[in-house]
Structure formats: structure tokens, C-alpha cells
């Protein structure tokens, strides 16, 4: 798989079957996160795996793939050989719909269950009840740390511009983190169906409590004042001829991201920062991935995102932040024999009290989490 895949196996040098029920894996580098991947990776017969495996999966779950109409629906049938309790539903049709279409289908009584966005949670539909599920899903905005002018190679060897003249200033990044009101955002955007995010791994054992920051608009303004960002006639700050203004990109087909972006821009006005929101397709967003703030969505039951978003050469290091201390902790976290021993190391990569370094809001503030 590719390096940006949740099932990244690029570090596996060789897999050797020692007998009918055991396999030994040899790696190119220490990488204990592979254990998380193996926990969810399907194991299939060699003869059944090929280029068309994705369209003809083999598994031991409750259901089997009966039909796949790409872009429209999949039809599942109960697996007669399932080892557990017999499925109560013998046939399941999963229709692929945008969130507004799913809501309309529920209103028309065309579906039994509809997955839609929290922005619609205040709407009632006869004979349906709302089910809210807790997740590890999070939303965060990358804040490019370099000065503009450089380039960085992305997918396909394309050189993308790097750096932002506003978010390059650590005072701006810290002020944004302290100035955003997450509770108000949750109330206004998703009708209270959410919890504040302070990192990509808040609910995980490798999450750091030092990532949590209370909203303090006065302190955020103080940081900007002390850094020389003075308010202009229109209330927007400037420093050395640079206006405190930047574009924020989000996926235009996501109503929650659109609403979060708008609320974020509105809150930043109080700090004297002008944010222009830009809804676009991912094809149009990626050229800006290292030069402009982007609202991303993350969520994993493995520390892979904690590593990749913060490691210097990580595929998710859109902030382009490089720090030897952070890298060292992340590398050490991957190398320890027992994953439980990696938790504290991942936490120190986020904030190390001894060195006063890390990606936390009081440190490099490379992201602002919502």
C-alpha cells in the first residue's frame, strides 16, 4: 500500500509462513504501529488475492458482497458460514448518498437508516429517531509554519508552494489556538452534537493533556499585540506591511466543514485576523496543502496520524514543521518493543515540559483543532 494509507505496509520487507497457522514479518525499520494495522487487516488466501480483489473481497464477517453498483450502492447477503450468531437481516442494501440526499430519502420513507450530518440534527422526521454515536473523528486546521518562497514535493513528484506570511508567525498560530471558542462552534454549527477537539488523538492513551487549551480571547490579543501585530483602520491587524489575512480551504461537498469554516472566520475577526473561506474540490485544494490553512478531517484508533501529522517527513505534515526533539520522540515511540511504552513518548512529542518544545498551543501551535 501507499505511504498515506491506513494499511501502510511499506516497512514490511518480507513475510514468511513458518507453518499453516504462523507467519513471521521482517521489517525495514522499527515500526510497532504495524500491530494496529495487523489488527484490522484482512488475511486472504494467496490465490484469491489479485488486482480485482477490491471488487471481490473474501472475509469471515456476517455478510458477503452480492452486488456492487459503483457510485450507487452495494448489496450484502448474510454469510451462511458465519461463525457467530446468525444475522437477523438476511439482505442489506447500502445506497451511496450525499448527506442532504440521505435526509430526503428518510423523509420519503425510502430507507431504514440514514447517515447524515450533525447540522441537520435539529430536524425531526416522523417514525425516525436520532442516534448519536461517539467517535474519534476530529477536525483541525493546518497552519503552515515556514516563510513563503519554497516548494515541497507532493504526490506524483509535483512541487507545491510552501509557506504562509501570516501563519509563519508563531504568535499568530498561538493566538488562533487561544482565541477560538470551540464550545460556541459546537453549539452554533452542529447543534451540540460534538465535543471540543484539542488534538488528533484526544480520546486515545497516547493523547496529551497538555494539548488542551481554554479559550482566552484577551490573551490571544495580547500575544498579537506583543508580537507587533497592530490593528488597522478596519480592525484587521498588520505587521511590517503584512496584513493579518489568509485563505482557509475546505471540502465544498461537506456542509459541516463549510459551517465550521464560516464560524471560525467569524471568530477570528474579533482577534483582528481576516479569514477568507474557500470551498473547493480536493483536486483544487491539494495545490494549497503546504501554503494555506486547510480544514482537514482525521480519526484513527492507531497513533499513525499522531506520527504522520507531526514528523518532519510525515505524509500529513501539512504545517511543514520540523523539530529534532519532536522527531526523536516519535522515532523512539515506534521503536519500543511494547506499544504501551510508546504512549508517553507520543505525548512528549506533543509537549515536552522539560524542553518547552512540541506542537501544542503553548509551543509550535502547528494546528488549531476544533
Labelled PLM ranges:
Residues 9-18, 165, 170-174, 186, ...:
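Extracytoplasmic/peripheral linker and loop segments enriched in polar/acidic and small residues
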Residues 106-107, 112-116, 123-130, 266-316, ...:
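Periplasmic binding protein-like
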Residues 1-29, 46-66, 120, 234, ...:
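Surface-exposed, Gly/Pro/Thr- and Asp/Glu-enriched linker/hinge segments
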Residues 10, 21, 30-31, 36-87, ...:
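Gly/Pro-rich hinge or "lid" segments in bacterial periplasmic/extracellular proteins
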Residues 77-80, 137-172, 179, 188, ...:
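A bilobed periplasmic-binding-protein/Venus flytrap-type ligand-binding module shared by bacterial periplasmic
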Residues 134-136, 140-158, 283-337:
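Acidic-aromatic pocket-rim loops
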Residues 49-51, 80-124, 265, 274-276:
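Ligand-site clamp/hinge motif
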Residues 163-265, 348:
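Append "and occasionally in soluble cytosolic enzymes with long acidic Gly/Pro-rich linkers
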Amino acid at each position: 500500500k501507499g505511504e498515506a494509507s491506513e494499511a501502510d505496509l511499506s516497512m514490511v520487507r518480507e513475510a514468511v509462513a513458518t507453518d499453516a497457522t504462523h507467519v513471521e514479518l521482517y521489517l525495514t525499520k522499527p515500526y510497532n504501529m504495524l500491530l494496529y494495522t495487523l489488527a484490522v487487516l484482512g488475511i486472504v488466501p494467496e490465490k484469491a488475492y489479485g488486482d480485482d480483489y477490491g471488487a471481490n473481497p473474501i472475509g469471515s464477517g456476517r455478510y458477503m458482497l452480492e452486488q456492487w453498483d459503483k457510485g450507487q450502492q452495494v448489496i450484502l447477503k448474510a454469510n451462511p458460514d458465519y461463525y457467530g450468531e446468525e444475522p437477523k437481516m438476511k439482505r442489506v442494501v447500502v445506497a451511496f448518498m450525499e448527506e442532504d440526499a440521505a435526509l430526503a430519502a428518510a423523509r420519503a420513507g425510502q430507507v431504514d437508516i440514514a447517515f447524515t450530518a450533525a447540522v441537520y440534527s435539529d430536524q425531526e422526521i416522523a417514525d425516525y429517531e436520532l442516534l448519536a454515536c461517539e467517535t474519534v473523528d476530529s477536525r483541525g486546521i493546518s497552519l503552515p509554519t515556514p516563510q513563503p518562497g519554497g516548494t515541497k514535493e507532493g504526490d506524483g513528484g509535483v512541487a507545491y508552494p510552501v509557506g504562509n506570511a501570516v501563519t509563519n508567525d508563531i504568535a499568530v498560530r498561538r493566538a488562533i489556538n487561544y482565541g477560538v471558542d470551540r464550545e460556541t462552534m459546537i453549539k452554533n454549527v452542529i447543534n451540540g452534537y460534538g465535543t471540543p477537539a484539542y488534538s488528533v488523538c484526544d480520546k486515545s492513551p497516547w493523547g496529551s493533556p497538555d494539548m488542551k487549551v481554554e479559550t482566552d480571547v484577551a490573551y490571544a490579543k495580547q500575544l498579537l499585540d506583543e508580537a507587533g501585530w497592530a490593528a488597522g483602520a478596519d480592525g484587521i491587524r498588520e505587521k511590517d506591511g503584512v496584513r493579518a489575512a489568509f485563505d482557509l480551504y475546505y471540502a465544498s461537498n461537506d456542509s459541516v466543514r463549510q459551517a465550521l469554516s464560516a464560524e471560525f472566520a467569524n471568530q477570528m475577526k474579533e482577534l483582528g485576523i481576516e479569514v477568507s473561506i474557500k470551498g473547493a474540490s480536493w483536486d483544487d485544494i491539494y495545490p494549497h496543502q503546504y501554503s494555506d490553512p486547510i480544514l482537514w478531517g482525521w480519526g484513527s484508533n492507531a497513533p499513525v496520524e499522531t506520527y504522520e501529522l507531526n514528523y518532519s517527513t510525515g505524509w500529513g505534515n501539512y504545517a511543514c514543521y520540523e523539530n529534532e526533539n519532536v522527531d526523536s520522540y516519535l522515532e523512539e515511540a515506534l521503536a519500543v518493543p511494547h506499544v504501551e511504552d510508546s504512549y508517553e513518548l507520543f505525548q512528549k512529542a506533543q509537549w515536552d515540559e522539560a524542553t518547552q518544545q512540541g506542537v501544542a498551543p503553548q509551543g509550535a501551535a502547528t494546528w488549531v483543532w476544533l
